[in-house]
């Protein structure tokens, strides 16, 4: 099953390349119980034994993989994804942090940003 999934993904990537009308950066976001690119060295969330991010880069795409909490809420994952893309101090917001008794701005969670110019004029593709 894993080989079929990877093969289908790669086939769709190759065949749709000629149909693509843009080269917006691709942001890969793992799901529930997932992991980031550097968190498990032997297996990639996006590709298993293969490396989908590296493959897409090899054919000319700009690709980034964000790492969010594996059991975090949708809200927390969205905030973490936003700051990893845009950059800045991770900030869950005062109301959310107070409501769930969590740190609003976790120490050491400052991101350079994969694509700080993300905006209406500079869109991205989010794949999750």
Stretches with model-predicted labels:
Residues 2-8:
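Sec-dependent signal peptide recognition
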Residues 19-127:
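N-terminal non-catalytic accessory region
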Residues 15-16:
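N-terminal signal peptide c-region/cleavage motif recognized by signal peptidases
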């Amino acid at each position: 099953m894993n080989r079929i999934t990877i093969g289908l993904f790669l086939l769709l990537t190759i065949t749709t390349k000629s149909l693509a009308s843009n080269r917006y950066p691709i942001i890969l976001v793992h799901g529930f119980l997932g992991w980031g690119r550097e968190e498990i060295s032997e297996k990639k969330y996006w590709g298993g034994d293969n490396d989908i991010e590296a493959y897409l880069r090899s054919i000319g795409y700009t690709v980034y993989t964000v790492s969010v909490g594996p059991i975090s809420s949708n809200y927390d994952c969205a905030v973490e994804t936003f700051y990893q893309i845009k950059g800045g101090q991770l900030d869950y917001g005062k109301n959310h942090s107070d409501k769930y008794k969590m740190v609003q701005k976790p120490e050491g969670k400052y991101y350079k940003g994969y694509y700080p110019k993300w905006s209406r004029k500079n869109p991205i593709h989010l794949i999750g």
